[in-house]
Amino acid sequence: MSNVPAELKYSKEHEWLRKEADGTYTVGITEHAQELLGDMVFVDLPEVGATVSAGDDCAVAESVKAASDIYAPVSGEIVEVNDALSDSPELVNSEPYAGGWIFKIKASDESELESLLDATAYEALLEDE
């Protein structure tokens, strides 16, 4: 079973979301998602300043197996991207919940968080796959 940190929120598309002290949210893909994709070779990051809606594809993770869209779990403005992934996309594999984060977003509608899964619900989703 993949590591599913209890303090994070999850989307059904295997993104995770963590609230930061400054009120922004950090987004990445789950350990389960990176295991399915395999070794990352490139991450196409969103543009800082871009406005996205929940469910929009806003980044792409390319691995040796496939390219997979990464979706915005909430609506808002992209305020930061993980530039380290340009040189080290493998961080998504080795540190999916730490150094392998993809982008940070300033949520425009925090009520959208209610539609995300907690760790228990995400683990149940994984068991059904």
UniProtKB/Swiss-Prot annotation:
- GO terms for CC? cytosol; glycine cleavage complex
The family database entries (InterPro entries) matched by this protein are listed as: 2-oxoA_DH_lipoyl-BS, Biotin_lipoyl, GCV_H, GCV_H/Fam206, GCV_H_sub, Single_hybrid_motif
Alphabetic keyword roster: Lipoyl
Entry cofactors: (R)-lipoate
Which Pfam families has this protein been placed in? Answer: GCV_H
- What CDD domains does this protein map onto? GCS_H
A GO biological process of this protein is: glycine decarboxylation via glycine cleavage system
Respond yes or no to whether keyword 4Fe-4S is given for this record: no
Q: Start and end of every Lipoyl-binding domain?
A: 24-106
State how the cofactor is bound. Answer: Binds 1 lipoyl cofactor covalently.
| Residues bearing PTM N6-lipoyllysine | K65
Q: How does it assemble?
A: The glycine cleavage system is composed of four proteins: P, T, L and H.
- Role of this protein: The glycine cleavage system catalyzes the degradation of glycine. The H protein shuttles the methylamine group of glycine from the P protein to the T protein.
Q: Which family does it belong to?
A: Belongs to the GcvH family.
The protein in question is named Glycine cleavage system H protein
Instruction: Give the species.
Output: Escherichia coli O7:K1 (strain IAI39 / ExPEC)
